[in-house]
Amino acid sequence: MSSGTKHTMEELLRRKAKKITDPAGREVRILEDAEATALAHHCRSSRHAVYEKAMALGICPFRYLRNRDIVSIEEQLRLAKSRVVVIGAGGLGGHVVLLLARMGIGHLIVVDYDRFDETNLNRQALSTSASLGRSKSQTAVEAIGAINPGVEATPYEIKLDATNAFQILDGADAVVDALDNVPDRLLLEKATKKLGIPLVHGALAGFEGQVMTIFPEDPGLRYLYGKGGSRIDKSKSPESVMGVPTFTPALIATLQAMEVLKIILGRGRIFRNAMLYVDMETGRISEFSFENR
């Protein structure tokens, strides 16, 4: 985009921004979705670029108005500039990408080689009768675009492995583990540690689930699976043995998305060297600390 176009976009944003009174009675400048779309077309730019420029000028995209009391416009801009990779677009990952898209994460990369089948319909947010047989990663990206065109989303319809992990993960501010087996999680953890990227782990089985955030210098999944985790038979995973009902992925994915938010904004208490464990059937929520172990 030329400097002249940038100047034009800034001028148009100031002109198109509306002053409204928010639900708390405060005056705020907002940019409505239709105006953002028209401006992106006029400037031959993306909706993402328009939102970023608007927030840099203190103009709140109308879709983020209800975020303002808990997330400042400066923090919302930081989210828009962030890049998050979600590995897996099934039970956990499908919910995670939708939540992060609504929150305004600027760049989402979705990695999943699988396709939807009927057994996914009970729990996976992106699974519908219409999506059966379709690529999970591609379906996720289409859903992200429908929810928030201000998010730049990229699908990878491949299985993450040692040959492609670094290329896919490089440059991310956070990576979400939405996998369903231990060997793949350990491979992912190894790659994120080498790249210096925080990893948000999530796992579930039955009505139980867990969340933990792993920074590069942390022992991480060794706390949970020991040193022999890579030899665990995928067919004997808790998910395979106990099944995964409807509610568990939605809750654990929400906790994972919140960990991503805390990492990017540098606020709140992250579950680092600690695991949050939830048993939805009993209503028990526990935290296990791994400090000094």
Segment roles from a protein language model:
Residues 2-34, 155, 160-161, 166-167, ...:
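E1/E1-like adenylate-forming module used to activate ubiquitin-like modifiers
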Residues 96-97, 140, 188:
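Hydrophobic residues within alpha-helices
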Residues 142-162:
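S-adenosyl-L-methionine
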Residues 77-115, 253:
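Glycine-rich adenosine-cofactor-binding loop
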Residues 238-276:
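Conserved anion/nucleotide-ligand pocket segment
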Residues 51-52, 111-148:
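Glycine-rich phosphate-binding loop and adjoining beta1-alpha1-beta2 segment
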Residues 2-84:
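N-terminal charged helix/coil linker that caps or initiates catalytic domains
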